[in-house]
From Swiss-Prot:
Ranges of residues in domain OBG-type G: 160-348
GO molecular function: GTP binding; GTPase activity; magnesium ion binding
Stated name of the protein: GTPase Obg
Chain intervals for the UniProt region annotation (Disordered): 20-46
Subunit text: Monomer.
Lineage, uppermost ranks: Bacteria, Pseudomonadati, Pseudomonadota, Betaproteobacteria, Neisseriales
Subcellular location field: Cytoplasm
Length: 384
């Protein structure tokens, strides 16, 4: 199935049914009073996150979604039937934005999450509601309310813990294949990866994380060159970036350091927030070099890019803020287990710190609420 990560649609909820104007007419009841019922509600349009849906391709071909109107009210005080709602299945990670107001309507972040996109109109009142002591035979009823109509932008941003970035043919797809069950297309030509691939990296029964591989970047990507610029947004939800570098390019004229600096420059031009994310350096394709040459190229590369952080052989206790460097061969799996182990440690600690921060903020908010409560001279809260 073709991977589509953007679409524009229009959703229209149904109109409420009109209230009825009707009088009771039965044998032996010649002057029956009003008995017109209310109209039914119009159908609403909902979005639902579905983990089994992974593209917005359906919304490229069907642009308008219209719910049905509610049924009008009936005599004998019978209400009109309400119209059924429409539920639009969308991939987890879909961001929905109102095109008219630029307001974010919803961010679908978990399976089963439901959000109302357009609310159906209420049914009109039947004239039974207008009967009074001075007006025993009212003839007015109210029409149903109009349903909401919205023009929406759908934008899919895949949900992953770790994102891979690098030049085409840096070995990103080979890496995600080596550490997960993902099987992206791999070949010896640029832009083999044409859309994001996700792989679940399982550490044990209780620990796993999701890795995202996007098409390779080239110089000028921030201005639209190549394929990767369209998919950089898919890295915005990640907690960690792995910058994969081909340390042994087939073309001897290619300088890995220049390519790495070009990637960093494109990242900065595209989005400062994305540029500021934690980013580790992964030097790949060591299987193409002997040990001495690999060491020489690593030293030359680190000097050229101005790497001022610990080297793999340094005895150093990594903290959450320090970028890390790894030397691997995704093809032979050399060094990949250590990489996966450290990623898991980092993500586990990151989640723990975020949970502690959220708990502290919640406690501080509760204290502030208590302090704002009015008190008597004795310090006892005044009853509301």
């Amino acid at each position: 199935m073709k991977f589509i990560d953007e679409a524009k649609i229009e959703v229209a909820a149904g109109k409420g049914g009109n209230g009825a104007t009707s009088f009771r007419r039965e044998k032996f009841v010649p002057r029956g009073g009003p008995d017109g019922g209310d109209g039914g509600k119009g159908g609403s349009v909902w979005a639902e996150a579905d983990e089994n849906t992974n593209t917005l391709v359906e919304y490229r071909f069907v642009k308008r979604y219209q719910a049905k109107n509610g049924e009008k009210g009936h005599g004998s005080d019978r209400y009109g039937a309400g119209a059924d709602d429409i539920v639009l299945k969308m991939p987890v990670g879909t961001l929905i934005r109102d095109l008219d107001t630029d307001e974010i309507v919803a961010d679908l972040t978990y399976h089963g999450q439901r959000v109302c996109l357009a609310k159906g109109g209420k049914g009109g009142l039947g004239h039974i509601h207008f009967k009074s002591s001075v007006n025993r035979a009212p003839k007015q009823s109210t029409p149903g309310e109009e349903g909401e109509t919205r023009s929406l932008q759908l934008e899919l941003k895949v949900l992953a813990d770790v994102g891979l970035l690098g030049m085409p043919n840096a070995g990103k797809s080979t890496l995600i294949t080596a550490v997960s069950a993902a099987r992206p297309k791999i070949a010896n030509y640029p832009f083999t990866t044409l859309h994001p691939n996700l792989g679940v990296v399982r550490i044990d029964e209780n620990h796993s994380f999701v890795m995202a591989d996007i098409p390779g970047l080239i110089e000028g990507a921030a201005e639209g060159a190549g394929l990767g610029h369209r998919f950089l947004k898919h890295l915005s939800r990640t907690g960690l970036l792995l910058h994969v570098v081909d340390l042994a390019p087939f073309d001897e004229a290619v300088d890995p350091a220049e390519e790495a600096l070009a990637i960093i420059n494109e990242l900065r031009k595209y989005d400062e927030e994305l540029y500021g994310k934690p980013r580790w350096l992964v030097l790949n394709k060591l299987d193409m070099l002997d040990e001495e040459e690999a060491q020489e190229r690593t030293v030359t590369f680190l000097e050229a890019v101005g790497w001022d952080y610990p080297k793999p052989d340094d005895r150093f206790q990594f903290d959450m803020e320090t970028p890390r460097l790894f030397q691997i061969s995704a093809l032979t799996h050399q060094g990949t287990q250590e990489l996966v182990h450290q990623i898991n440690q980092y993500l586990t600690e990151k989640k723990r710190l975020e949970a502690e921060k959220a708990e502290a903020e919640k406690a501080a908010a509760n204290v502030e609420i208590i302090e704002q409560q009015p008190k008597t001279d004795t310090g006892v809260f005044k009853p509301e």
